[in-house]
């Protein structure tokens, strides 16, 4: 957190208006093989939580943005251990790429989970910008591709329509 605040001060001194915290702020996300999908703040990394960091950044006169990759999950994550059935599969097995799986956005419960969790974080920490990452091609989607994209549009609408300034 100390390093992030030092970077934020440097960003402010350079005239930046927005400070965006990238990947690694949550769960057991210490490498690209673990924690993706577990969007609870890692208090060892951010003792004051996202709210505390965001407040400090705003006190410097900048807005605060945050990274998410809500469509993906690592097999080494609490979310996957709790809901392995939420991962997209190719016939019978999940399709692993870049150490991650895609969540099945054709399923209403998956979309609800993403919307509820991301919305709560945005609202609690006063996030003004979301960096929505996605580093997978859609080959694993197959026949579900159209319904997956409709599910993604539903998630985006439900998160951002009530928050037009994000």
Q: Which ranges hold each PLM region?
A:
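Conserved structural scaffold segments of CAZyme catalytic domains across common CAZy folds
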Residues: 1-65, 71-80, 97, 102
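Active-site neighborhood of glycoside hydrolase catalytic domains
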Residues: 42-60, 81-166
